[in-house]
Amino acid sequence: MAPVAVGDTLPDGQLGWFDGEDKLQQVSVHGLAAGKKVVLFGVPGAFTPTCSNQHVPGFINQAEQLKAKGVDDILLVSVNDPFVMKAWAKSYPENKHVKFLADGLGTYTKALGLELDLSEKGLGIRSRRFALLADNLKVTVANIEEGGQFTISGAEEILKAL
């Protein structure tokens, strides 16, 4: 399947997350993004070095600037279970705006055409690193990394595009 691209409609899918009352919920991507301008970014895995030290902190630190430029929500998706994503979210006590969403079976990542086979490293099927900007479900920016690179999918690149 071809990767999601500018002009595409974000596919719908169910993702897991813990709400403000610490209850596990299944949420629809369309329910989160319809009628809004959202950043949807994906990482290969929770607690991995580049994801934890650069990619996620970049969006947390730039969240206010993104919101000032019209972004309604910042959504992080990873092929991990909701409990791992909850623990990862708690490792960023300064986070006020990034929602940590779990794609436990990788079905949403596959619908985006962004799966990455890391079986040789013992990680199974994961997500390519990416950052999408979508306005009312239409993809307006699609910054998709090759391999393990981190060059175009950070918050700074999304800010430049706004």
From Swiss-Prot:
Task: Please indicate if the UniProt record lists Calcium as a keyword.
Answer: no
Which one GO biological process term can you cite for this protein?
cellular response to oxidative stress
| Record-annotated Thioredoxin domain positions | 4-162
Q: Name the domain of life.
A: Eukaryota
The disulfide bridges present are none
Cite the GO molecular-function annotations of the record.
thioredoxin peroxidase activity
Give the matching InterPro entries: PRX5-like, Redoxin, Thioredoxin-like_sf, Thioredoxin_domain
The record's subcellular locations are: Cytoplasm
Question: Per the annotation, which location comes first and is thus the protein's main one?
Answer: cytoplasm
Tell whether Cytoplasm is among the UniProt keywords.
yes
Q: What is its EC number?
A: 1.11.1.25
What keywords tag this UniProt record? Antioxidant, Cytoplasm, Oxidoreductase, Peroxidase, Redox-active center
Check the record and name the CDD domains matching this protein.
PRX5_like
**SUPFAM superfamilies reported in the protein's UniProt record:** Thioredoxin-like (SSF52833)
Note the Gene3D superfamilies from the entry. Answer: Glutaredoxin (3.40.30.10)
The entry's active site is: C51 (cysteine sulfenic acid (-soh) intermediate)
Q: Which GO terms describe its cellular component?
A: cytoplasm
**Reaction catalysis annotation:** [glutaredoxin]-dithiol + a hydroperoxide = [glutaredoxin]-disulfide + an alcohol + H2O
Q: What does this protein do?
A: Reduces hydrogen peroxide and alkyl hydroperoxides with reducing equivalents provided through the thioredoxin or glutaredoxin system. May be involved in intracellular redox signaling.
What's in the misc comment field? The active site is a conserved redox-active cysteine residue, the peroxidatic cysteine (C(P)), which makes the nucleophilic attack on the peroxide substrate. The peroxide oxidizes the C(P)-SH to cysteine sulfenic acid (C(P)-SOH), which then reacts with another cysteine residue, the resolving cysteine (C(R)), to form a disulfide bridge. The disulfide is subsequently reduced by an appropriate electron donor to complete the catalytic cycle. In this 1-Cys peroxiredoxin, no C(R) is present and C(P) instead forms a disulfide with a cysteine from another protein or with a small thiol molecule.
Family from the record: Belongs to the peroxiredoxin family. Prx5 subfamily.
Q: Could you describe the subunit structure of this protein?
A: Monomer.
Q: What is this protein called?
A: Peroxiredoxin-2C
Q: Which gene encodes it?
A: PRXIIC
